[in-house]
Amino acid sequence: MKKSRSVMAVTADDNLKDYFECSLSKSYSSSSYTLGIDLWRGRRCCSGNLQLPPLSQRQSERARTPEGDGISRPTTLPLTTLPSIAITTVSQECFDVENGPSPGRSPLDPQASSSSGLVLHAAFPGHSQRRESFLYRSDSDYDLSPKAMSRNSSLPSEQHGDDLIVTPFAQVLASLRIVRNNFTLLTNLHGAPNKRSPAASQAPVTRVSLQEESYQKLAMETLEELDWCLDQLETIQTYRSVSEMASNKFKRMLNRELTHLSEMSRSGNQVSEYISNTFLDKQNDVEIPSPTQKDREKKKKQQLMTQISGVKKLMHSSSLNNTSISRFGVNTENEDHLAKELEDLNKWGLNIFNVAGYSHNRPLTCIMYAIFQERDLLKTFKISSDTFVTYMMTLEDHYHSDVAYHNSLHAADVAQSTHVLLSTPALDAVFTDLEILAAIFAAAIHDVDHPGVSNQFLINTNSELALMYNDESVLENHHLAVGFKLLQEEHCDIFQNLTKKQRQTLRKMVIDMVLATDMSKHMSLLADLKTMVETKKVTSSGVLLLDNYTDRIQVLRNMVHCADLSNPTKSLELYRQWTDRIMEEFFQQGDKERERGMEISPMCDKHTASVEKSQVGFIDYIVHPLWETWADLVQPDAQDILDTLEDNRNWYQSMIPQSPSPPLDERSRDCQGLMEKFQFELTLEEEDSEGPEKEGEGPNYFSSTKTLCVIDPENRDSLEETDIDIATEDKSLIDT
């Protein structure tokens, strides 16, 4: 399968200059500091190199301790509008999804036209301001180590104005760009224009144009910048990928956010534990089952695992023929109503619940048949309608109707969402038909035979599946095994007319995409995509080539992952129905854990779970950062999705019940526990030693007034500042 090669090019403004100053916006008070999160806001005076914070500021940030931390924690962060992608194709060059780009031109060939491919345009100034995710906050507010792995700020990209760069590897590249630019200024060297000198044709800056003081200052800053880069590179573990630097940074930042959330209230602690246990890939303690449970499991282990569990006999006729296939692939007495619903097949937010109601609860078969007809995939890959419907009905039968959320309704919703994301204008003509087939098929099978419990539950109970897959992505591996095994059933092989090479490639892609739906891999997926996009933003070549399997599957994996986490981006009516279903499934798992005498998983206890708060946390820490990154890739096509997401988040925030104040003694205990959880010590600086003493105080006492951030336990977004007078005994004549 061949298709025109697609590239993503970053185009620079014709008026970009080679060097520009940077300014830092930090929230300081004249007499007091505010405790919170800082956010670097560099503004370009003129473009040409990636703007970074001054080295002196970065070095002081790296070495600082939480004492006297003069930083502010904004409750809302202004949205930096993201670049768009315009798509064209390169007719003279072909991309083979199995083999990569056609020979004859290097992907990094500077003669390659930047106007042909995926072009990252500058941001549109008219876009409304929107909250940014926690990824754009400082990651070192309370970092005591002077060897922080990443910058303490977010950085604007070189050719995209205020697009902030947050991934460590892209920040190192940006810093090296500044070093190179400063070197040309200091040495007055001017070579022929090349991909690293986009502004080489500008008037040269001569050595004498810099005063001696400015020259020495620039030389010292350049040396310090280079030292910073070396310091970062020396700490990189050679067996780690550069995107793992971003993954570790994001995990560290999320852990800090969750720590804050857990300290606010009991319900916040439960939400924090749920997000941490579900979306962070870490080794959890395995709960040892009771002896009676061991006896039950022992009987299961005695069965030979020679077959894939979950595969059952057909519950429908396998003798379908083309003449018996209905218009929508399913029998229905409500064809007109179903046709009306399917008019939204290509729209974000199709009501899949109505489709299920009009299709005799066959939403997956109906949606998949409609998508394959819409995309002409049946004809392209020579799939007979009867074989396709037979397989889809067999697949749908292997979704459990008694599971509240992870059933065929969810699979149909993810498949339709993937179909819409593949059709986004920014990605038009980017993916081959085989890749499209693989993505939609992966979405359809990604939760087949889901038992309605989590991977950790299966591991803790020593289930047969956990033993078979060695506790690694247990359910995701099982979904793949069942999905592919069903192709071997009678009249079910929808890929029988693919070539051997196509089948192998499709299988590899589907496996990669379904394994990516393991929520514990979320941070790695997010970091991979963000690193890829930001790295190409800061490189002078400005070209993101989707000409190899790794880059292309990375986009597809994140696409299916986005579709899997798309409920909060749909209309509030649909979102609330999905929320009710997932909470019902969680509570059913909690009941099973209670019956077994196990510790109940976070958000699975129907007596204590805070549904509204869990959805706000889910959006803030998981869904928003993911869709924000996806919007970076397909700007401006995802703006409406982000708007809906923010509206839904605000609605759930408004629905959080206001808890009454606890008794005084209980509040005292909570405060004591909160203080014990703090991982840093707050030290306030001494007031001017010549200041007036308070009446009744001796010379060994001083008064210090500082501004602290007081956070509402039920609403972190509302902050108020309170002046606190603290009397402290001065035991030293030296300022602390």
From Swiss-Prot:
What reaction is this protein's catalytic activity? 3',5'-cyclic AMP + H2O = AMP + H(+)
* Listed EC numbers: 3.1.4.53
Annotated GO MF terms: 3',5'-cyclic-AMP phosphodiesterase activity; 3',5'-cyclic-GMP phosphodiesterase activity; cAMP binding; gamma-tubulin binding; metal ion binding
- Give a brief account of the tissues where this protein occurs: Widely expressed.
The residues that hold Zn(2+) 2 are D447
List positions binding Zn(2+) 1.
H410, H446, D447, D564
- Where are the Phosphoserine modifications? S290, S659, S661
Q: How is its activity regulated?
A: Inhibited by rolipram.
Task: State the disulfide connectivity.
Answer: none
User: Which protein, by its recorded name, is this?
Assistant: 3',5'-cyclic-AMP phosphodiesterase 4B
